[in-house]
C-alpha cells in the first residue's frame, strides 16, 4: 500500500489512558484509538494518569520522499518529534526505535552522536525537535528493496507499582508508515536468526468464538486484518512476569493478519536480548494458525524489577502488506 503524504500520528490521552492502534497507511493524519487501561480500584491511578498522558506528533520532514538508497554510505532520513501538549502539561519522554527489514536497527541522530538502539528524547510542552535518523542498514543484500519504519515508545523507562502493575499508556507503541530502501550495497548483516523455539498450531476455538461473537459481518474475516501479539503473564489479567533462579520462561502468541514473513525481537528494559545467542526469532504466519514461541531467558545481570516486551515486524517485501506490532509490556520480577 503506497504511502501518501507525511505521517502525523497524534497520541492523545484524556483522563483515562489509551492504547495506540495500527495506523491506516492511507491516512494523512492518524489518531490513536482510545481504550481505558485503568481499573477503577487502582490505588495509584492518578499517578499513572499523569505520567502517561500527553499529545505528541512525529513524522518525516521530507513529505515527498518515499524511497532512499544505500550505497555504502549512511542513510539519512530527516525526522521530527513535537510535543503538542498545553503549557501546564508535563515534559514528554519518547523512546524512538528504528526497524530495517524487520530487524532492530542501531542508529544516531547527530553526525557525531552516540549510536544506540533506542534514542530517548525529552520534549517540553510546545517544543519541537528536528534531526536525522542516520544509519547503515543492519539487513538487506545488494539488489533488495527493504522496508524501514520508525516507532515511538511513550515514557519508555516507566515502571508500574509491583502490587498493582497498571501501565496506562506508558510503553505503548506508535509507528510511521514504512519507507523503502533500495540496497545498492550489502547491509552489515551481522544479526542472526533462530527458529528453534517456534511451533505452529490451530487458533484455539475459544479465541475464534470470541471473534465471531464480536465481529458478526460475513463480508470479511476480521482476523485477516487484525494482528494479535501477546506475551503470557505469570498471573491471569495481571501484567507481571516472575523469573526464578535468574531465569524466566516466556511464551509469545502471534495470530491474525496476513500470511507474511516476520521477525520477533524481545526487549528487556528497552534493549534487545538474545535467545540462544541469536538476535531474533524468524517466523512465517499462516491464515487460521497461531505462532507460539516458548523460550527461557537468562536474567543474570539484571536488577530485581524490569520491563519486558516483544516487537514483531515484517521482513522482505511484506512490509508493504503489514508492518509492526508490540505485546503489552510486563513488569518482570527477577528472583
Task: Identify the meaning behind each predicted range.
Residues 19-21:
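Bacterial signal peptide processing site
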Residues 158-214, 316-335:
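Short beta-strand elements
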Residues 25-71, 199, 204-237:
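Low-complexity, acidic Ser/Thr/Pro/Gly-rich terminal tails and inter-domain linkers that flank the onset
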Residues 76-84, 249-255:
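Short edge beta-strand/loop segments characteristic of extracellular beta-sandwich folds
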Residues 110-140, 277-296:
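Intrinsically disordered, low-complexity Pro/Gly/Ser/Thr-rich segments with frequent PxxP/GP/PP motifs
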Residues 89, 138-149, 158-160, 300-309:
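Short glycine/proline/serine/threonine-rich loop/turn segments at secondary-structure transition edges
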Residues 86-106, 254-272:
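Short acidic, flexible loop segments centered on an aromatic residue
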Residues 14-17:
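C-terminal motif of bacterial Sec signal peptides marking the signal peptidase cleavage site
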